[in-house]
UniProtKB/Swiss-Prot annotation:
Its EC number is 1.-.-.-. The active site is at 55 (proton donor). This is Uncharacterized oxidoreductase P32A8.02. GO terms for molecular function: aldose reductase (NADPH) activity; D-xylose reductase (NADPH) activity; L-arabinose reductase (NADPH) activity.
């Protein structure tokens, strides 16, 4: 492990928006705990909050952000807020869904993603066209996708969109490399967000990971986060404990050796922690 004191904690998207390189995810946060946990994450230094309509906590996330900014005299523009469209359907349903998200959040959206390509080509393209209009109005600052495979991305590019996707959020960790999608995104300047980067905690005691982390004198969680960062991804992590929030964010003052990054990358098993199926291969 080597120290890296000058590493940036943000990255610039293709549209010029600056996004923090680590996000705090609100997936499966209990409704009655979400406000406190998002507030705690902001107190811990997170400036990137990731929610979605299907999480059922957009209203709590939005209120926590607005309240925290007011209490701490922080500009709303200093916080990066992501939400997602639950389902691709038709143009008008997508517009209604976006208006609903904006209402629940009580603030503009920095990044809005199509959460799943499910629904078919016609629905995907119609949903994207609707999203673009909210970029024009300023209610959404950036648009992107989630769980898009290469064919879905190619389809979107072929539709001659007004705005190209800034981000593709997919499941990524050493046990699921998604090399074809990663390569396509990198070649088209699409930032890659990694969800389930800590494997939902399932592999934190993995016999392959534990000795590597021990040798580097870091936690397995920090090892996985550094792997994600050094691969060029933006990990979306979640924790309900303050000490874990802090340690998971304390990863910008060191790097792991390139050979360790390569070793971790060799662990690919096409194993999904977040789902029992591959959402990137739907028609």
């Amino acid at each position: 492990m080597s120290e890296s004191q000058t590493e940036s904690t943000t990255v610039t998207l293709t549209n010029g928006m600056v996004i923090p390189r680590i996000g705090f995810g609100a997936f499966m946060l209990k409704y009655n705990e979400c406000y406190g946990l998002v507030t705690q994450a902001l107190d811990s230094g997170y400036r990137h909050i990731d929610t979605a309509a299907v999480y059922g906590n957009e209203d709590i996330c939005g209120k926590a952000i607005v309240d925290w900014c007011e209490k701490n005299n922080v500009k709303r523009t200093d916080i990066f807020l992501t939400s997602k469209l639950a389902n691709c359907s038709d143009y008008y349903s997508t517009r209604a869904a976006i208006r609903s998200s904006l209402h629940h959040l009580g603030t503009y959206i920095d990044l809005f993603l199509i959460q799943s390509p499910a629904g078919g080509k016609k629905s995907r393209i119609a949903s994207w066209k609707a999203m673009e209009e909210f970029v024009d109005s300023g209610d959404i600052r950036s648009v992107g996708v989630s769980n898009y495979g290469v064919k879905h991305l190619q389809e979107l590019y072929a539709s001659n969109p007004k705005f190209y996707p800034c981000v593709n959020q997919i499941e990524l960790h050493p046990f699921l490399s998604q090399d074809d999608i990663v390569k396509y995104c990198q070649s088209h300047d699409i930032a890659i967000e990694a969800y389930s980067p800590l494997t939902h905690g399932i592999r934190l005691n993995d016999e392959k990971l534990v000795p590597i982390a021990k040798k580097l004198n870091i936690s397995v969680a920090q090892l996985l986060i550094r792997w994600s960062l050094q691969k060029g991804y933006i990990p979306i992590i979640k924790s309900t404990k303050k000490e874990h929030m802090l340690s998971d964010l304390d990863v910008f003052n060191f790097t792991i050796p390139d050979d360790v990054v390569q070793e971790l990358s060799s662990f690919d098993e096409h194993w999904h922690a977040g789902t029992t199926y591959d959402p990137t291969v739907c028609d």
